[in-house]
């Protein structure tokens, strides 16, 4: 699986996030936003293009139907942000807090989540293609009725995550950890797991193993 990284210009203009509130259309492009804090904000279908965010805080904000292309978030707090029906392409989240962040019905393609907190994140009914989760906390994350294609979980914490009505065929969970998952036998067909995880799945599915 090859993930296309963000195509971000090496020459970005420094801007304050507040400029987006003064635009006729809420668009940020070709810019760098550093250290800004705008919590509990509302933006009507915002669009971020070719932009980098560093040490920004947007907790409890409503960014529903946001469009992001060629964007990088580093050390940002996006906890409880609403990104319902978002379109997120060629984007990176690095060392970010996405606790309880909502991505229902989103389209997420060529996206990397690295060293980030996504406990209680909601991705129900999302289309997720060419996406990697690396060293992420995803406990109690909700992947209900998602469409996965080229999705990887590398050394993640997945305890009590939900995958109901989401096929894990071709997904490699072998380097990740969990005690229990909310999943059925149909969803785990074709999933790649470690020997220990195979025993865990057998227990989750009600099988009794005799030695």
What are these regions (language model features)?
Residues 2-211:
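Tandem repeat scaffolds
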């Amino acid at each position: 699986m090859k993930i296309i990284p963000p195509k971000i210009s090496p020459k970005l203009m420094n801007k304050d996030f507040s400029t987006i509130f003064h635009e006729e259309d809420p668009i940020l492009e070709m810019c760098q936003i550093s250290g800004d804090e705008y919590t509990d904000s509302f933006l009507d279908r915002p669009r971020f293009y070719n932009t980098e965010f560093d040490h920004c805080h947007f907790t409890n904000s409503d960014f529903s139907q946001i469009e992001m292309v060629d964007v990088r978030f580093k050390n940002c707090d996006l906890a409880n942000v609403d990104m319902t029906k978002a379109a997120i392409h060629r984007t990176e989240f690095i060392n970010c807090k996405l606790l309880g962040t909502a991505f229902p019905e989103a389209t997420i393609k060529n996206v990397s989540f690295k060293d980030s907190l996504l406990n209680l994140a909601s991705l129900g009914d999302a289309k997720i293609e060419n996406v990697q989760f690396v060293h992420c906390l995803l406990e109690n994350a909700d992947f209900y009725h998602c469409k996965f294609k080229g999705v990887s979980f590398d050394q993640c914490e997945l305890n009590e995550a939900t995958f109901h009505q989401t096929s894990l065929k071709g997904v490699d969970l072998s380097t990740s950890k969990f005690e229990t998952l909310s999943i059925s036998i149909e969803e785990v067909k074709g999933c790649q797991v470690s020997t220990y995880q195979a025993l865990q799945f057998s227990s989750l599915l009600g099988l009794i193993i005799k030695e």
